[in-house]
């Protein structure tokens, strides 16, 4: 299983990369806005510069989302983003216009991430259109009393049935159990906020054991 970090914060990306477990990065307009703050406008050029800065930190794929809602606009923005670095993956929503853009990008050898996926039928269409990745949002489904992990199970089963090469990125991850369940189901990737990466590392018995070992080690003369 691959781990992506779901953030636009450069410090968090660097910290995750230093752990040696980071395979890629996903961003979206909300994460970019969080980094930009409200002090000044975040221009399109500033957005592209920020994606370029992320690409300098990581070796793996970096997903950057288009903001246009029509296929032509998505294609124009996506081509600009793809020109930044060969690692850039264009995130497009699974809409009628988004599927057109995904199909275009597939025909032109530009990687795509079909995002805002909440049903197996959306994931099936994304794979048929040629998406490189598909991102079902498990946490947001859980928020509306729907089993997000069941969606992952359905998508993985469908893709295996028909040998689709589209990879499943489990997105909107809220806690470490989401990651464990995704791994057990067989999802290709989990994209994880930095706080959840820290949750994956932490266990109270590890901390208690380390405390005891440290106390006992104090009697050893070096």
UniProtKB/Swiss-Prot annotation:
It is an enzyme of class 2 (transferase). It catalyses: D-sedoheptulose 7-phosphate + D-glyceraldehyde 3-phosphate = D-erythrose 4-phosphate + beta-D-fructose 6-phosphate. Pathway: Carbohydrate degradation; pentose phosphate pathway; D-glyceraldehyde 3-phosphate and beta-D-fructose 6-phosphate from D-ribose 5-phosphate and D-xylulose 5-phosphate (non-oxidative stage): step 2/3. It comes from the Bacteria. Gene3D superfamilies: Aldolase class I. The active site is at residue 91. GO terms for cellular component: cytoplasm. Its EC number is 2.2.1.2. It is found in: Cytoplasm. It holds the Pfam family TAL_FSA. One of its GO terms (molecular function) is aldehyde-lyase activity. Signal peptide: none annotated. Keywords: Cytoplasm, Pentose shunt, Schiff base, Transferase. One of its GO terms (biological process) is carbohydrate metabolic process. Belongs to the transaldolase family. Type 3B subfamily. NCBIfam families: fsa_talC_mipB. Transaldolase is important for the balance of metabolites in the pentose-phosphate pathway. This is Probable transaldolase. It comes from Chlorobium chlorochromatii (strain CaD3).
């Amino acid at each position: 299983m691959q781990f992506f970090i779901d953030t636009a914060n450069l410090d968090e990306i660097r910290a995750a990369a230093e752990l040696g477990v980071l395979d890629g990065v996903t961003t979206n307009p909300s994460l970019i806005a969080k980094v930009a703050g409200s002090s000044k406008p975040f221009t399109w050029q500033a957005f592209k510069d920020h994606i370029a800065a992320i690409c300098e930190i990581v070796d793996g794929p970096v997903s950057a989302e288009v903001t246009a809602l029509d296929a032509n606009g998505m294609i124009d923005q996506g081509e600009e983003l793809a020109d930044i670095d060969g690692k850039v993956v264009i995130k497009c929503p699974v809409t009628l216009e988004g599927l057109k853009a995904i199909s275009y990008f597939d025909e032109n050898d530009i990687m795509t991430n079909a995002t805002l996926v909440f049903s197996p039928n959306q994931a099936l269409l994304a794979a048929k259109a040629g998406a490189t990745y598909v991102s079902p949002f498990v946490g947001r489904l859980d928020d509306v009393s729907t089993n997000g992990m069941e969606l992952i199970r359905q998508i993985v089963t469908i893709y295996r049935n028909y040998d689709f090469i589209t990879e499943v990125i489990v997105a909107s991850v809220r806690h470490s159990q989401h990651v464990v369940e995704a791994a057990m189901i067989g999802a290709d990737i989990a994209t994880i906020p930095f706080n959840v990466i820290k949750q994956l590392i932490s266990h109270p018995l590890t901390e208690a054991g380390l405390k005891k070992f440290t106390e006992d080690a104090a009697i050893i003369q070096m």
